[in-house]
């Protein structure tokens, strides 16, 4: 049986087989997996907010924001042998967990997180091979670097793989 490496909120980590990597509690947050299928290494970030400019402090958790988490994850993957040109991405989350009377853009955190992750991945030239984003239900995801499958358990909808 393989060991599961857990990634908390505003957290990230990397794995090699036989380990898998999992995060839970993806509501408006986005879970992003970057993997090198040649080296069989993978990393996951649990991103809470789209832009580090939203942070109020000089010192902040880089794993919390789309614009900084993906750079940090990339450097951790390269440190264990991943090649940037071989990296691919899968992502899930970005739900709209609550309905609001106004159409205030600030309340669309899930959609803004998804857009920020996609923008950053484009900047890094990392293709997104699969995604399961949006909706209004929370998700738990687990990635296996050996099979390259992302298992997604969505509240009230069951499980699927991408």
Swiss-Prot record:
CDD domains: CheD. Keywords: Chemotaxis, Hydrolase. Its EC number is 3.5.1.44. Transmembrane segments: none annotated. One of its GO terms (molecular function) is protein-glutamine glutaminase activity. The keyword Hydrolase applies. GO terms for biological process: chemotaxis. It holds the Pfam family CheD. The keyword ATP-binding does not apply. It comes from the Bacteria. It catalyses: L-glutaminyl-[protein] + H2O = L-glutamyl-[protein] + NH4(+). HAMAP family: CheD (MF_01440). Deamidates glutamine residues to glutamate on methyl-accepting chemotaxis receptors (MCPs). CheD-mediated MCP deamidation is required for productive communication of the conformational signals of the chemoreceptors to the CheA kinase. Forms a complex with CheC. Belongs to the CheD family. This is Chemoreceptor glutamine deamidase CheD. It comes from Halalkalibacterium halodurans (strain ATCC BAA-125 / DSM 18197 / FERM 7344 / JCM 9153 / C-125). The lineage of its organism: Bacteria, Bacillati, Bacillota, Bacilli, Bacillales.
């Amino acid at each position: 049986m393989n060991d599961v490496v857990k990634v908390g909120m505003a957290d990230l980590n990397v794995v090699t087989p036989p380990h898998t990597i999992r995060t839970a509690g993806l509501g408006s947050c986005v879970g992003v997996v970057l993997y090198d299928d040649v080296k069989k290494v993978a990393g996951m970030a649990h991103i809470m907010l789209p832009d580090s400019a939203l942070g109020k402090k000089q010192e902040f958790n880089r794993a919390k924001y789309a614009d900084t988490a993906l750079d940090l994850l990339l450097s951790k993957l390269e440190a264990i042998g991943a090649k940037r040109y071989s990296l691919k991405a899968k992502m899930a989350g970005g739900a709209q967990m609550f309905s609001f009377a106004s159409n205030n853009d600030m309340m669309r955190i899930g959609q803004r997180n998804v857009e920020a992750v996609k923008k950053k991945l484009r900047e890094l030239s990392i293709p997104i091979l699969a995604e399961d984003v949006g909706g209004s239900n929370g998700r738990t995801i687990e990635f296996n670097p050996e099979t390259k499958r992302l298992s997604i358990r969505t509240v009230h909808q069951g499980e699927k793989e991408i």
